[in-house]
């Protein structure tokens, strides 16, 4: 695990955006260290398709969940985090060569979807579709 170079609060701060029965979508204002292991575990399913860089670490959680301008959303089922979707303004990715080549780079009008994942056992229930719908709105 990489060294942690930041102060961490244990409790996440979220705002419920949508809910239906046992399912809800929350905007993360701050991802607390109590949720890191769950987020990292969920991200492991991305490694198969996208490689080891897709797995979250405490540092990438700080970068993409707790950075001003990013748009991190989580999905919960019966209170447990089951997935997440993270949007990053394209202009914040100025160190990425491919981002600088995008026709919208510098216009401050584009959100890049950094990650979108829902745990396998919750697929087929419409939860991923609802998370995406909230994210796009």
Region spans (language model):
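Short amphipathic alpha-helix that is part of the acyltransferase structural core
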Residues: 4-60, 67, 72-77, 81-82
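GNAT-family acyltransferases
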Residues: 41, 52, 63, 89, ...
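Residues in soluble alpha-helical coiled-coils and helical-bundle/repeat scaffolds
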Residues: 48, 122-123
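Short secondary-structure capping micro-motifs at structural edges
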Residues: 60-62, 71-72, 98-103
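A short, structured loop/turn motif at beta-sheet edges
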Residues: 80, 121-122
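Conserved acyl-donor/pantetheine-binding loop and adjacent beta-alpha core of acyl/acetyltransferases
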Residues: 81-115
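Conserved acetyl-CoA-binding loop-helix of GNAT-fold acetyltransferases
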Residues: 114-118, 124-137
């Amino acid at each position: 695990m990489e060294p942690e170079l930041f102060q961490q609060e244990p409790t996440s701060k979220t705002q419920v955006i949508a809910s239906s029965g046992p399912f809800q979508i929350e905007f993360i204002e701050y991802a607390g260290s109590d949720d890191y292991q769950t987020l990292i575990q969920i991200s492991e399913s991305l490694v198969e398709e996208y490689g080891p860089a897709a797995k979250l670490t405490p540092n990438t959680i700080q970068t993409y969940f707790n950075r001003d301008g990013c748009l991190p959303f989580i999905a919960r089922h019966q209170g447990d985090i089951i997935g997440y979707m993270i949007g990053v303004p394209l202009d914040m990715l100025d160190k990425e060569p491919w981002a600088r080549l995008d026709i919208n780079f510098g216009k401050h009008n584009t959100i890049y979807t950094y990650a979108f994942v829902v745990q396998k056992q919750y697929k087929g229930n419409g939860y991923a579709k609802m998370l995406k719908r909230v994210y796009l709105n």
